[in-house]
């Protein structure tokens, strides 16, 4: 086969859409710990094959310039062909409620010509448990239970 192939440029925002930070209210008592979630909708270009997706994150309790690479294992497929994926920091203790958790997402796929591509957000997303609790308290659509949970988070901050 002869001919020329040209790269197709894809905007990263077409592949990775950050939905924000949230707290899992069902797994812990906020006076002790909570679960901080970073939510995404992810996609790959048409005509490509999905390999994996996940995140690069910074350690909160250990000072290191290196990122930790974490591959997602619990994606939810949406009817439109996109994937909902969440990075959850488990069992965040009250002493870390003001700490900034920092991550950036990636999605990896193979193009029709066999080229493997890993698309990574250019900037890190950063949230603290305290910031997410503040956002819940300010949100007009937050339920009474959500606001109570957020108030308990704020009360637990030392």
Where are these regions (language model features)?
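Conserved "repeat-terminator" motif of extracellular CCP/Sushi domains
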Residues: 1-12
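Short, surface-exposed linear motifs at loops/turns and structural transition points
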Residues: 12-158
């Amino acid at each position: 086969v002869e001919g020329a192939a040209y790269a197709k440029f894809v905007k990263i925002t077409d592949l990775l859409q950050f939905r924000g930070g949230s707290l899992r209210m069902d797994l812990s008592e906020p006076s002790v710990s909570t679960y901080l979630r970073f939510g995404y909708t992810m996609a790959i270009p048409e005509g490509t094959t999905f390999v994996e997706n996940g995140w690069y994150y910074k350690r909160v309790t250990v000072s290191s310039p290196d990122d930790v690479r974490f591959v997602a294992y619990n994606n939810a497929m949406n009817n439109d062909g996109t994937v909902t994926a969440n990075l959850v920091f488990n069992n965040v203790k009250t002493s870390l409620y003001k700490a900034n958790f920092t991550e950036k997402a990636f999605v990896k796929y193979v193009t029709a010509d066999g080229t493997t591509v890993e698309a990574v957000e250019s900037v890190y997303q950063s949230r603290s448990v305290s910031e997410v609790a503040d956002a819940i308290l300010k949100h007009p659509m937050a339920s009474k239970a959500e606001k109570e949970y957020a108030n308990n988070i704020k009360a637990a901050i030392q």
